[in-house]
Amino acid sequence: MRFFIILFLFFFQCSFSQIVYESIESEALGTTRELKIQLPRNYELNSDQFYPLIVVFDGDYLFEVVAGNVEYISYWRDMPDAIVVGINQAKSRTEDTTLSVEDHFPYRSGAKFYEFIDSELIEFIESKYRCSDFRIAIGHGETANYINYFFFQKSPLFNGFVALSPSFAPFMQENLVRKLRIEQKKQVKLFYYLSTASLDIKRNQKQATELNYKISTIENPSIFYEFDNFEGLSHYSLVPRSIPNALDNMFSVYQPINRDEYEKNILTLVSSPVDYLVDKYETIKDLFGIEKQILINDFKAIAAAIEKNKQYDFYKDLGDIARKHHPETVLGFYYLARFFEETGKPKKAMNAYRSSYTLGSIQGYSKDEMLDRADAIQKEFGY
């Protein structure tokens, strides 16, 4: 079954995305490194769009898994289109991840590889491709441990870290927990995903579960953390299960409002649900550099909360935003009319419904319904 899933992702990827193979001359390493790069569909057409950058260590075997998932998930708009870069390390993995026996930080060839990533690779990619400031690092085993050294930077090079069955260096858990506690004082959002499995390398599973316990005690609204401990999977088979979960965690704010978000975050608000909607899309813009049009699904979720909690005054603000994001449709006038209806201004409600006559219908809101509502008000009040 796993074979067919991977085969499907491969053909799905090949059908839509553009794969580029690049070589980069590295002064830090004194050699050439091979890269695999997946560009988003319609990359050339969307010439003004900038994209999140996902850097995949162990690109020899991880790149296709990550690229296929990115292509599939972004197709359904549960994450933005992204640029995926895989670093081939089959012949240099041991040298790339070399650590000091004293402080267990990158050393010699490991330090050179760190410099390559920090000072050369990102600049090389961003000089050739349109990347936003949002970056994710993905590693497996030794490289899952290695990516954490970028997390320790004062201003981390990456916003998101995906550690798949990490083979932690000594003191790595303590250093991570200490760093996470320091980040409590900052407002910068960081994402961290950690996974292991019941059939994982025993040392890796033990350390991952211990780290998860420690991280779970930290209350930090700026850190978006997710942990998976899969049953019946091994060090290698956990990878294709982890990647979609990790991406879901990294890009959860980008996704349409679902039932869980609606019930836990919106219905329970004591403040404005409209402000929540605005903040959600401002966060998308700030994190990913994307001006995303507010989805009809999300307008409907906020409207449902207004109705459920009888907070009808918020309909006016919702209508103003709807007219800004969907000006050619009846949506904004519908919410404005509902505001007038529920605040004792039926004549203004009738006029608002009728103002939508020249506008287009949209996902359950038709101009015929608007006119029917206007006629019903006219009949009831005798205007």
For each of these PLM feature ranges, what is it?
Residues M1-V20:
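Bacterial Sec-dependent N-terminal signal peptides
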